[in-house]
Amino acid sequence: MVMKMNEETCIEELLNGLNMGMIAIDHLLDKIENEKLREIVIHQRKNYGDLKNKVHQTYPHAEDKTKQKFMLESMIEMKTLLTDDAKIAKMLTEGSNQSVKTMTHLLNREQDIDQTLKSYCDDFEDISKRYIEELKEFL
């Protein structure tokens, strides 16, 4: 039997995805050489931050903790010791793909989710999918 996901779990996962995306960008930004790629990444960081602020305004009770932050930061630093823009674009694409899959899975399991929260989750998916498309030329 599949357990129903509650609203707090969905908010937590949404914030976790946004935070992980922003942390990854923060660690990679100074390693990007291509100016166009840098602008795409900066724009993505802003979109994630704006959506995170909307979530916090709508759900001020939401706990904002990033799961596995240390592991993410360590992995990024290790993978970018010897890297180039194509590898960075690949890492960001893979992270965005994982976020889309996770959010889709969660939403498919929940039928009675608050419509505002569903809208934010859909926004997160849309932002991530657009970002993936923009990154393709750098792979």
Identify the function of each model-found stretch.
Residues E13, G17-M20, A24-L28, K36, ...:
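Non-catalytic alpha-helical scaffold/packing segments enriched in small hydrophobic residues
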Residues N53-K101:
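Carboxylate-rich helix-loop segments that flank metal/cofactor sites and access channels
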